[in-house]
Amino acid sequence: MLRSLEDVLTKPGQVSGRALDRHAAAADASHFLLVPEAVVTPTDAAEVGALMRASAAQGVSLTFRSGGTSLSGQAVTDSVLVDVRKNFRDIEVLDEGARVRVRPGATVRQVNARLARHGRRLGPDPASEAACTIGGVVANNSSGMNCGITENTYQTLESMTLVLPSGTVIDTAAPDADGILRHHEPHLYRGLAQLADRVRSDSASVATVRRQFSMKNTMGYGLNALLDFDTPAQILAHLAIGSEGTLGFVAEAVFRTVVRPTHSATALLVFEELQAANEALPALVDSRAATVELLDATSLRVGQRLTGTPPIVRDLRVQDHAALLVEYSATTAEQLEELRQHGEALTGRIGLSQPAGFTTDADARAVLWHLRKGLYASVAGARPQGTTALLEDIVVPVPALGRTCTALTQLFDRYDYRDSVILGHAKDGNVHFMLTDDFADPARLQRYSDFTEDMVDLVLGEGGSLKAEHGTGRVMAPYVRRQYGDELYGVMREIKQLCDPGGVLNPGVLLNDDPQAHLRHIKAEPSVAEEVDRCVSCGYCEPVCPSRDLTLTPRQRIVTLRAIRSARLAGDEALAQSLEEDYDYAAVQTCAVDGMCQTACPVEINTGDLVKRLRRQETGAVAQAGWNLAAQHWGTASIVAGRALDLAAKLPAAATITANQLVRRIAGADTVPLYSPELPRGGGRRRRPAPVGEPVAVYFPACVSAMFGPAQPGTGAPGAAGVQDSVLALAQRAGVELLVPSDIDALCCGTPWSSKGKHTGQETITARTIAALRRDSDHGRLPIVCDASSCTEGLRHALEVEVPPAGQQPLRILDAVEFTAEHLLPRLPEPRRIPSLTLHPTCSSTRMGLNPALARVAEAIAEDVQIPDDWGCCAFAGDRGLLHPELTASATARQAEQVQAIDASAHASCNRTCELGMSRATGYPYSHVLELLNQSTIAGG
């Protein structure tokens, strides 16, 4: 099978049967788990068509996977999994943002980032927009909090390029699309026309379809296409929407975009009981509220446990209460004020349990949204170890929402599902709830089965749909016939047969006559590590992970550990060892431990913490002792590193490279850094100027600048002012005195030891550094300013466990960028601005919230400041980019293309090693932003 698939692809390595690749790709965000036989990565639509023809000939099924954020099991398989994310990320904005052409691997957030500059966005607004991709948005007919059924995928998709299982490619935007379809697929063309006639001629079918699709509904195929469109090509395109990869492959889609609101006002409205909240919905919907989110009493109780919960919830004695999170949005302040006043007037007439007001303050609004979005994380993160989270999604007519939620709560009580919060999009009658259980226990699986039967009866009895926006998948496929009836279910079966007569696309998904299908292949999540056990495999971490296109993502690092543990529990030691053999490079060596995964994770997992511990466990006593010795003599060690770069620059490059490669082969690529000629010379010792006045801060120049000298635009030669000289010059120019510790050469934040798992040396160096900083800061009175963002973060982490001595203040660590933006910039001469600047925020500056200050400094330097749309962590990660340059090359590839297209006057960041990584990736010299500020404020310069 693997050979037959390889034969139709153009590059080696596009088909993998390796155990690590198969198990890493097995899990998506759903509660199902199937391990594919192979993972295939095609490069374009033509290869996908060839794959489908080859799979049909072999009788092998295919399942497409892009973002892997689907929740109903529609993107898992035990056959061939086709990755249509990696090579399908193109985005083309059309008509100044009125339309956009997108391929399936681009995320909604990436598309909206490009549309934002035109004041537009996509209509579908799924909560998973940071990670979900256009492929899934189309395949699931995604909607979201705001779009309802008027701006969802079905309503806003203008055209698509669809690859059928036969290999036929149909661009529905082509004037002769129907002619092409009729010529190449005559049976399909006639069959679609006949099915449209069949449904239209049956008044009962028409009534059922119209009722079903008058609300959010992703159960089964979108039969409304048979009523809404007249030509087979358009019918086919709109049947493909929501078809979950069972009819063909959507290689490209063109969307009509919608206006992007720029002003919002938000309030949390609390009611005495659920029915009162339900009764308020019509008035709120009529008032043109953009969002109305429901939180039931259990949600409010769980929300009270969240950090930062607003007083309106925190101080509430919850009984039968419910709340609606209401938001108005507009494109102008005047429009918003009109909506806000109408909303304020409504609050006095809809029976609130306590007064409420709408706020436009960004921080206050963020607190309210944190409550809503934190509920899922709170319940999922607190679930018992070894249990699986299952998120359900239903819709009923809005008038039935209150009694449906009440009945659901009674079902939770009957089946003893505790903390099962009900929340969702109230104005659409669409709610979500989560169950957590150990479904490997037969009794608990039976409980879930019984609960599901009662839930299905409840929802269908209220005239609702069993899936509003998450797709049918495997979880509701056995119930499609019950929701639609035999006649329309038969129509769906014929649609599948017409498009995919060989049944090669995603069998078992969307239509399944096995009444137990939803109870099979439920994911087991054995406990593997405290740092990551609460992971729900949502995939939100993947777009921000720098190793995502090279080896593994954080989700894949975790699910592979679970696969190893499951194999051992099942007695399959051979599989466990096979996975472990490949795990070290893929999961440990090529992890940047940048913590960006935590910024995207709804349960705040930093997979880097796990990797650091694994590195620590792998480190032998000799290595620990060696790194501890370096910590004890760090002043000498850091200077020697810089001198080594000076020496390398003087020697013939070929000789240096040859010797370096030989040592790497002997000692290992994860031990000896790779030398390359574009590296700068050494940076020299950290200076300590004599103080001339009363210092306002302690200045901690990072040791990385002692190892790596500054960039010299155009030449790479020494002599430019590095970041330490620049900070001191800026402070002097602003009339601000800084104190540099007397023993600065021996001090370090400890990050190199922490990231490598060298805990003994880390303890040695951080103890010395904290003692020196406490001494020179007058026991915490003065702030400490560091000039490299990763080192700033390292110092903050080191201080997390420090207990200040009695009577002393905690040490305050500031980054030089934020210190400059607040204290120096207002006192400096007006900078001479350059035309343009491309800025690279770092993972550390992002995690610490420093990017607004970074942008402020950059905007003082340049007329035009741009951050590439595909910005991300460069993965240089201290020395990781020297040990594994392939990691940085992969992480920066798309960003580098955009940097080169921008071709700015200058390029800047706020961390020396990140500057090295971006210089290597782009060919442009990157400097610290404060070096550029220094140059632009030199008198007469």
Regions found by a protein language model. Give the residues of each.
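C-terminal substrate-binding/cap subdomain adjacent to the FAD-binding core in PCMH-type
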Residues: 137-139, 147-150, 157-371, 523
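Iron-sulfur cluster-binding electron-transfer modules in prokaryotic oxidoreductases
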Residues: 500, 608-941
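Iron-sulfur cluster-binding cysteine motifs and their immediate structural context
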Residues: 503-510, 540-564, 590-617, 794, ...
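N-terminal flexible segment immediately upstream of the FAD-binding catalytic core
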Residues: 1-57, 67-98, 127, 175, ...
